[in-house]
Structure formats: C-alpha cells, structure tokens
C-alpha cells in the first residue's frame, strides 16, 4: 500500500501558495484494509476514508469509464491493481495531476510541473471532454490563477468550445453551475470566469441573459467602454474590490452581474439609450436567479439593485418622497447592513466604466445621511400621539419625509 499527497495541495505547494486542504491517494489497498486500520468510510459515489486522527481524506486509486451523459455518467474501478498513473490521468488538468510521497518525492507523469512553470492550464487527455463540469472548473481556475499569469492552453480552449457546441453542458444541474459560480466569486478575479465562458460559447448556454448584453451599446459619455456586456464585467471586477466590506459578498457579486440585464431588452431604435432598463431588468434577473436556484436572499438583493441602482446615482436630485420609497423598498429599517451592501453595489456600477475606476461616490454618504436622520424618527412617539394600525405607517412615513426635507437644502 502506497500513500500519496495529490491534487491542489501539491500544486499550491509548488506555486508557493498556502495549502488549505490536503487530499491523499491510496494505491494498492482495499476498503477492508483501511477500515481495519481505523479509517472511517464516507461518501456514496466512491470510497473516501477519513484518517482516524487527522480526519484528512484518503481516496482509493480508481479508473473511470464513461457509460452515460453528464458528470455522473461513469463506471469506476477501485481495485488494488489501479496504478498511480492510471488514477492521475483521469484528472482534469496537468497541474492537478501531480503526486508526492511521504519522502517528498514528486511524481509528475503528465508534465504538470512544466505547465506550472509556463503558467498553462492544459487538459491531460481527450477524456476531459467526458465531464462537462470540467468546463466550469477550468474557467474558475483561470479566474483563481489570473493574477499569477495563468492562461488556458489553446488546445484546451478548443476542446471546451467543442464540448459546448455538442450540447454537453445541458447535462449540468443548476446546483452545480451555481456552486462553481459561487467559487468563482470567491477568487480575486471573478470576471475572468465569465470571460472564459463567453470565449467558449458557454455564457450563452448557462447565462443567456448576461450574454445578450454583449454588443449592446451605451452612451459613450457615461460609458467610455460602450459595450453593455463589457461594462458588466467591469462592474463585477469593481464589486470584488469592494466585497471585503460587504456582509454578503456573494449577493454583491450576483447583483453586479444582474444589475443591467434590462439593457439586453432595449428596443434597437432608441439605442444607445436605455430608458426604463431598471424595471425591465427585474424579470430577467428573477428568471436567471430562479433557473440557477440561487438562494432567496441573494436573488432578492440582486432584484433590488437592478430596480433601484440608478436612483442611488441620482440621490442628490431625488425628492424626499422618492428617497423614502427606495428606503422602504430596501427595508433598511430592519436590514441596515443590506442597505450598506446596496450602496456598495451602486458604487461598483459607477466605477465599472473605463477611466472611472477610482472615482469618488459621494451618493453613498448622502444616502447614509438621509438614512440617519430618517431613522431617528421614533415610532413609539407616533403611537403615543394616538395613531393606530395603518395610520402609524402613514404618519411614520410623513415624519421621515419631513426629516429628509429639513436637511436636503444643505446638500
């Protein structure tokens, strides 16, 4: 029985990156042998065992043979005769097919170390095309390692394009697409994930509402980048820069993607203007979120940002009644942190334009100021003044509007 450290741990170690999770491969063993040594078996798809002390994962070496569609359509062989090379060749990329034994010796049968040096994401074998999930994984790795200069090998891009064209991505479940997208949002450059998907044709399959934005022009004075799809990529990039201040970074990134989907529905005869794109965008934002089974809180936040982001841009011009309408829609009285995330999303939109990346966004401070004075209106005082039931809400709104009016002349 031989045990090897494999996968991401070896890759990240060779890149001098922090190693978070360690996965081990066991060659020449049976489940019974591991159980006898105190390992605990977990997982139903294939034998994975937890070390009795460290609780790290140990998997039996295996071979896979395609016998169906999608990423579940495989037969697996876990016999003790499966070699290290046979196990590693079933993996997706060469950089993920490097092993290390207990003495520190590296086993690299498929050129992973050279591809690490060349900053290349390259598939190991044609069997890559048997698992459509690998398309999303490679796009995510491109996002994760973008800052290190990694690119996808041309032959791998070509294979991913062929997989997309033959309809293999249709077998991906919504849950897997959303999970990989969430992981992409957690990288430093999530916009690269979507750029890769667009390059291989997968954006039109998985995110058609987003893909529809590319080629749709915007007024150059407000959007030097002109293209609505390019603008959305820039907004995602800016949202990631701001995400460290967000309560829900995933919701912030998803809202950045969804905020301008209405521009894909603009009539051609009024382009490059997009009158009413905010309200038009609510339906595609909801449909895309529902189709990917996005959680309710993330979906609701994206819809709110879609409908009200331009209100925030015009905060200094809004009537107090409109300011309060936005505040009530956001339910900022009960969810003040979501309000802060909303302001971050609007700031990302304002900065997600060529040459605007470092612009100030004073609208956020103004909105916070309005919120501060409106929140000081005491609901208990309204009740003590004799208002009841619906009249409480109406009077509360009136007093909040008055509070905003008092400070507005000073803006």
From Swiss-Prot:
It comes from the Bacteria. HAMAP family: CCA_bact_type1 (MF_01261), CCA_bact_type2 (MF_01262). This is Multifunctional CCA protein. Coiled coil: none annotated. PROSITE patterns: HD (PS51831). A single active site specifically recognizes both ATP and CTP and is responsible for their addition. Keywords: ATP-binding, Hydrolase, Magnesium, Metal-binding, Multifunctional enzyme, Nickel, Nucleotide-binding, Nucleotidyltransferase, RNA repair, RNA-binding, Transferase, tRNA processing. Monomer. Can also form homodimers and oligomers. It comes from Actinobacillus pleuropneumoniae serotype 5b (strain L20). The keyword tRNA processing applies. Pfam families: HD (PF01966), PolyA_pol (PF01743), PolyA_pol_RNAbd (PF12627).
